[in-house]
C-alpha cells in the first residue's frame, strides 16, 4: 500500500499524478499525520513547483471548478500544515522562491482568492522558516515595493505587517533585517499611498499598517513614525487639494494611534523591546504633538457645516447636512488630544474654540451617538483636568450647565436646539437621543463638585441647576440604578461606576451567589401553571441549568 488513504491502495510513485492526490478527501489529514510515503512524495521539487503554480497562476475561466477552487485550496493547505521538509524544499531553492513571489509582479493578475492563498503561504514561511525567508527578501528588495503597491488587498497587507515586524508575533532572530527595512524607507512608501491612490481600501490598509507599527514595530520604525517630520507628511497628504476624505480620516487614525495612551502592548513584546533598546515605549514627543497642533486650525475649518448643502433624508426627517465620517474623526482626534494631558494642547484648543465647537455639534446632531460618546469624553477630560482655565472655559465660555438645562426643557427636535437635524413636516418631533449622555455628564459634574471648588461654585450660582437636580436628575438616577433591580447586577458591583466604558469584563469579581439568587428569584413566579407554554418551559429549563452551573462555580471558587 503506497499511502494509507482510501482509494490509493493501487497507486505507486511512478504512475501517480499530483492532481489525483489533490482530489482525495483525506489528503490534508494524512499530511497533518505526517504520513511518511505521502510526505516523501510531496517534498520533491517537481511536486512543490506544481503546488506553487496552483497558488500563484490564475486559472482559465473555462477550466474545471476543482481546478479553479479545490486544487489551489488544497495546495495552500499542504503548505500551511507546516511540514518541515516541504517548507525546506521551498525556501532552499531560489527558483521555487522566485516562482512564489512572481505573484507580486505588476503584470501578474492579482485575484483576491489566490492573494489569500499566497499570503497564507508567505506568513507560514515567516513563522517556520524566518531566516531563509528574510534573507531572500533582503536579496530582492523589489519585493517590498511590490507588496506596498498591492496594499489594497487585505491579505497582502497582512503579509506586509508581518514582514516589518508590526505584529504580536515577534521575530527576535532577525533584528538586523528590521533595520534594513528601515533603511529602504518602507514607511515612506506606505504613507505615500495616501497621495498616489484614490482607493478608500488602499488608504484604510495603509493606515492599518501604520497603526500596527505604533503598537508592535521595532524601535527604529516606531521612532520614525512618531517623528514630527513623518506626522507632517501625513497631514500634507490629508490636506492636498482634490484628495478624497478617506485620506483625512485614515491619517487621523494614525495620529490617534500615536497619541492614545491606552493602546494595547503585550508583555512578550515589552520584553522584546527591552532587549533591543534601553528606553521605554515610543510615544508622540512634545515636538510631534506641536506638529499636530499646527494643523489643528485647518482641521477645525472642516468642522464647519454651515456651508455644506447636501441633505440626507432620514426616518424622522432630514440631516442638513449629515455630519460625515471625516468630521467625526476630527472630534475623536480632539478627544484623544485632550486625554494626553498636554497643557500646550489644552491652551491651543481653547484659543481656537475647538471645545465650544464640538459641544455645539453635540446638540445639533442629537441622534449621532458616536459623536456624543467622543464629546462626552472631551467634556470629562476638561472637567478632570488640573488646569483651572480649561475647567472655567467649559463651564463659563461653553456654558455647559446652561446648555444641559436648555436641552432638558426642550427634549424634542427643534430648529433652535438641533439646527441641522430637522423633523419631517406633519410628524410629531421625536425625543432627542443624547439624554443618557447628558445624565452622565451631569452626574460627573456632581461627583467632581465634591473635590473641585470651581465646579461647586459654578453649580451653586445656577439657580436652575438645583431645581433640576432635585426634581429630575435624582429621580432619574434612582430609576436607572440597575443595582437595585431584582434581576440587575450583583450587589458586589455597587461600588463601581455605572456603565463604565473603560471597565474590562475580565477584571470583574462577580458575586456568584448573588447571581444565582437573583436568577432564581426572577424565574420562580408564574411557572407552575399546568397550561404554561413551551417557550416558558424552555426559559425555566435554561434558568435552572444556569443556576446549577453558577452554584458549581461557587463551590469550586470557595472550596
Predicted feature locations:
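P-loop NTPase catalytic cores that bind/hydrolyze ATP
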Residues: 246-253, 328-332
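Amphipathic alpha-helical interface segments used for dimerization/assembly
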Residues: 122, 255, 334, 362, ...
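Alpha-helical bundle/repeat cores within regulatory domains of eukaryotic proteins
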Residues: 368-450
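Long, well-ordered core segments of solenoidal/helical folds
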Residues: 104-105, 358, 404-408
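Extended repeat-based solenoid scaffolds, especially LRR ectodomains
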Residues: 264-340
